[in-house]
Amino acid sequence: MAEQEPTAEQLAQIAAENEEDEHSVNYKPPAQKSIQEIQELDKDDESLRKYKEALLGRVAVSADPNVPNVVVTGLTLVCSSAPGPLELDLTGDLESFKKQSFVLKEGVEYRIKISFRVNREIVSGMKYIQHTYRKGVKIDKTDYMVGSYGPRAEEYEFLTPVEEAPKGMLARGSYSIKSRFTDDDKTDHLSWEWNLTIKKDWKD
């Protein structure tokens, strides 16, 4: 049986319903301080110095200035029932993702994992923003608060809450997703586009 494509009216209705779920928060970020400034504050207070060291680690602030402060390295769809890994290497050719598509079985539970590094300074209020399109119509916008992170050698990983893939005949098909990793200063650390195909089964 041929898949039934959603009409423009149905897509508009989905977009309107998702628009109602979006919430805006009046939040004013605090003034940004560098790692060096934080380390210099109350440096004669031994207990505070130890606390900051535990919080920030032994940070080397003389990192290569030519390397971006935040480097987003990968996106993974975490799904226990997937037959194989669903991963994007975000350090390579981002344009190639427009020609590929993840296959996700309808109705399964999954999470999105973003892997990233912070190289020099603390970054406040990082966010992962995702716009989802179907047949050129934006049907969903989701903002995930990632939080504030300081520099370290190891990668950080952020996991979104568990979500359920859409299901049903109208939900099956291709989706285009525009992703952006930003922060309180509205710095665009990385923007990329990728595709998702909802199918009745993993290998439909």
From Swiss-Prot:
An individual GO BP term: Rho protein signal transduction
Entry annotated with the keyword Ubl conjugation: yes
Q: Which keywords fit this entry according to its UniProt record? A: Acetylation, Cytoplasm, Disease variant, GTPase activation, Isopeptide bond, Phosphoprotein, Ubl conjugation
Altering D45A: what's the impact?
Loss of RHOA interaction
Annotated segments matching region Disordered: 1-36
* Annotated positions of the N6-acetyllysine modification: K43, K105, K127, K141, K178
What the entry lists under InterPro entries is as follows: Ig_E-set (IPR014756), Rho_GDI (IPR000406), RhoGDI_dom_sf (IPR024792)
Task: Give the sites modified to N-acetylalanine.
Answer: A2
Q: Which residues carry this modification: N6-succinyllysine?
A: K141
What Gene Ontology terms describe where this protein resides (cellular component)?
A: cytoskeleton; cytosol; extracellular exosome; immunological synapse; membrane; nucleus; Schaffer collateral - CA1 synapse
Q: What is its main location?
A: cytoplasm
Q: Extract one GO molecular function annotation from the record.
A: Rho GDP-dissociation inhibitor activity
Q: Say where the cross-link Glycyl lysine isopeptide (Lys-Gly) (interchain with G-Cter in SUMO2) occurs.
A: K138, K141
| The keyword Calcium belongs to this UniProt entry's keyword annotation | no
Tell me the compartments it is located in.
Cytoplasm
Q: Which residues are annotated with the PTM Phosphoserine?
A: S34, S47
Q: Record's family?
A: Belongs to the Rho GDI family.
Q: How does it assemble?
A: Monomer. Interacts with FER. Interacts with PLXNB3. Forms a heterodimer with RAC1. Interacts with RHOA, the affinity is increased by three orders of magnitude when RHOA is prenylated. Interacts with PSMD10; the interaction increases ARHGDIA association with RHOA, leading to ARHGDIA-mediated inactivation of RHOA and ROCK and prolonged AKT activation. Interacts with KANK2; the interaction is direct and may regulate the interaction of ARHGDIA with RHOA, RAC1 and CDC42. Interacts with RHOC. Interacts with CDC42. Interacts with NGFR (via death domain); NGFR binding decreases the affinity for RHOA.
Q: Which disease is it linked to?
A: Nephrotic syndrome 8: A form of nephrotic syndrome, a renal disease clinically characterized by progressive renal failure, severe proteinuria, hypoalbuminemia, hyperlipidemia and edema. Kidney biopsies show diffuse mesangial sclerosis, with small glomeruli, hypercellularity, increased extracellular matrix, and contracted/collapsed glomerular tufts surrounded by immature or abnormal podocytes.
Relate the protein's function as given in its record.
Controls Rho proteins homeostasis. Regulates the GDP/GTP exchange reaction of the Rho proteins by inhibiting the dissociation of GDP from them, and the subsequent binding of GTP to them. Retains Rho proteins such as CDC42, RAC1 and RHOA in an inactive cytosolic pool, regulating their stability and protecting them from degradation. Actively involved in the recycling and distribution of activated Rho GTPases in the cell, mediates extraction from membranes of both inactive and activated molecules due its exceptionally high affinity for prenylated forms.
Give the protein's recorded name: Rho GDP-dissociation inhibitor 1
Q: What species is given as this protein's source?
A: Homo sapiens
